[in-house]
Design a protein with these regions (language model features):
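Feature responds to low-complexity, polar/acidic, surface-exposed segments characteristic
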Residues: 1-74, 81-146, 160-236, 245-247, ...
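Helix N-cap / beta->alpha transition motif
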Residues: 40, 100, 148, 299-301, ...
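Amphipathic, non-transmembrane alpha-helical segments in extracytoplasmic/periplasmic proteins
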Residues: 44-48, 75, 101-108, 152-153, ...
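Short, flexible, surface-exposed loop segments at domain boundaries
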Residues: 154, 164-227, 231-545
Length: 545
């Protein structure tokens, strides 16, 4: 799911919980156990009052067992005043008893407009359960005698996203009044929050557009030819050319703010990483690739739209693009989409990234230079729409550091440029060099790819047993190699001696290090003992100190 950054970080947050917490109806739970716990009648009353924006009532007590000292008295009184609840008989509400499924349905039926229908179809509890099935707000329960917080959230979401009922009394030919039920176009989400739940295909975003789709500015997207604002800091690219369900708040006819979006499970999708590509058979119009070490193939439609690095491509063929991956010109992926679910792939979305090690920028910051290859340098000013992202897809606003590694995807028409800044680093001790494959193994035997440009320029530092400091690109390739940072070692001084080579004098230290080894170190440059600095040549002074 995608929402604002703080909430989207937890992948376990359901759509229902996210939207209700966004609207302020509930607080997002930090503990899965809280979601599983049974809730009371008071808990559900509190949720419903917040959802309906009723406001608490604290000047009238409606139930004998809910005095003003009860934490939920204001909410329970508000529901009673609105004639949504009438208690369990005898003037009591039983606020601290566990709420049942049927009781929750009865509370929801009045604001939804279904209470008359439910009473006419059996009353409490069967009529309300039948009505829930009819309106499709029903949920699967773990326990029929109680309702968990998670179940209450789903039930409340279903009720608020379902169209309400209008009930009118109509006199028949026999003179009797009968109820007439009409489904309205309104939902409780629309009535109280101007919030809509919709679905469609994401045709355009700031970074790419399908054929015929309008271009948008930063923070916007097009779904089914309607423009929406994306008000959270997240990477909407993952939903490009996908069928999506989304929630938006309508501020005006021209201002619609998406607060939530997710992919729908409709239309077949095949994603192939560039590392798995084997070949492209032009005569069969077939892409061959490996999946779990098994050679497979997929055949898109010959008239399929190809979107390369955001732009509907006309100058490059699918053979050209696949060939570029196989020849290691760039790294990325191919996504084939059957958007209309007719069994054929009519849309092919491709992103091919070139990675470089940043050695610096032009004085105006528009040209980014590569440390190892001048041909990889990129002029951002040559592109119409430029986005910087971090490796998580969030907007990157910091100044580029030197050294650092970026991966960029540029459309052939100079319209779109996406730059992703990698933040993955590590220190490695090389155990094996596989020069023919541009790979190394670390001391744990892990095989690591090295970018070809980096490998060729840093051959002298890519040697067995050497310690290197590296920065990876977003695909796990080493694209920068530097010397490991000097480390601080501590231990016990075992012996001290002065060495006189005839040209200079140095002090040798024999130290038991933290890992239990006895090692000899030479002083170099400045030596500081108890806060006093000495030049390395002052052997006698160091020895005395």
């Amino acid at each position: 799911i995608i929402g604002d950054k703080a909430n989207a970080e937890s992948e376990d947050v359901s759509k229902e919980e996210y939207i209700l917490s966004y609207l302020g109806i509930i607080e997002k739970s930090e503990d899965d156990e809280d979601i599983q716990k049974s809730i009371t009648r008071a808990d559900f009353a509190d949720m419903l009052v917040k959802a309906l924006k009723l406001g608490e009532v604290n000047d009238m007590q409606y139930f004998d067992d809910v005095d003003f000292s009860h934490w939920a008295s204001g909410a329970i009184n508000a529901l009673a005043k609105a004639e949504i609840v009438n208690g369990n008989g005898g003037g009591v509400f039983e606020p601290d008893e566990k709420i049942t499924y049927a009781q929750a349905l009865k509370m929801l039926s009045k604001p939804m407009g279904y209470s008359v229908y439910a009473e006419a179809n059996g009353g409490f509890p069967t009529g309300y359960i039948k009505t829930a099935v009819m309106t499709k707000i029903n949920i699967t329960l773990q326990n029929s005698d109680s309702l968990s917080m998670g179940e209450a959230i789903r039930l409340l979401y279903n009720a608020f996203s379902t169209k309400t009922y209008n009930v009118s009394s109509v006199k028949g030919s026999d003179g009797r009044n009968t109820n007439q039920y009409d489904v309205s176009d309104d939902t409780l989400f629309k009535i109280y929050y101007n919030l809509y739940i919709d679905e469609g295909t994401l045709n355009s975003y700031y970074g790419g557009a399908m054929e015929g789709a309008s271009e948008v500015e930063s923070g916007e997207c097009i779904i089914n030819n309607e423009k929406y604002s994306v008000i959270f800091n997240a990477d909407i690219k993952d939903f490009f050319a996908e069928n999506v369900e989304f929630a938006y708040i309508k501020k005006s006819d021209t201002q619609k703010d998406i607060i939530y979006i997710e992919k729908q499970d409709s239309g077949k999708t095949t994603v192939i990483n560039s590392e798995d590509l084997d070949a492209f058979d032009e005569s069969a119009y077939q892409i061959r690739y490996y999946n779990n070490n098994t050679l497979r193939s997929v055949s898109p439609r010959r008239d399929a739209e190809i979107i390369y690095n955001g732009n509907s491509e006309t100058s490059l063929t699918l053979k050209d693009i696949i060939g570029g991956f196989i020849d290691k010109k760039y790294r990325g992926y191919v996504k084939l989409r059957d958007i209309d679910n007719d069994g054929g792939y009519e849309t092919i979305v491709v992103y091919g990234y070139i990675s470089l090690s940043v050695s610096g920028q032009s004085s105006d910051g528009k040209i980014i230079y590569d440390e190892y290859s001048s041909s990889k340098s990129i002029d951002t000013d040559a592109y119409e729409k430029v986005t910087f992202k971090d490796s998580n897809g969030w907007e990157y606003t910091d100044k580029l550091k030197t050294p650092s590694v970026i991966s960029y995807a540029a459309s052939t028409d100079k319209k779109y440029l996406e730059i992703i800044v990698s933040d993955k680093t590590s220190d490695i001790k090389i155990s094996t060099v596989i020069e023919s494959e541009y790979k190394i193994r670390d001391e744990n035997g892990t095989e690591i790819n090295v970018d070809e440009s980096c490998f060729n320029r840093k051959k002298n530092e890519i040697k067995q047993s050497m310690n290197i400091s590296v920065i990876y690109d977003i695909f796990g390739y080493i694209c920068y190699i530097g010397k490991t940072e000097d480390t601080i070692k501590s231990g016990y001084l075992a012996a001290l001696a002065a060495e006189d080579s005839g040209f200079d004098k140095k002090v040798m230290l024999k130290i038991y290090t933290e890992d239990g080894k006895l090692e000899v170190f030479n002083t170099s440059g400045k030596v500081k003992i108890d806060g006093v600095s000495y030049d390395e040549g002052e052997a006698a002074a160091i020895y005395t100190a």
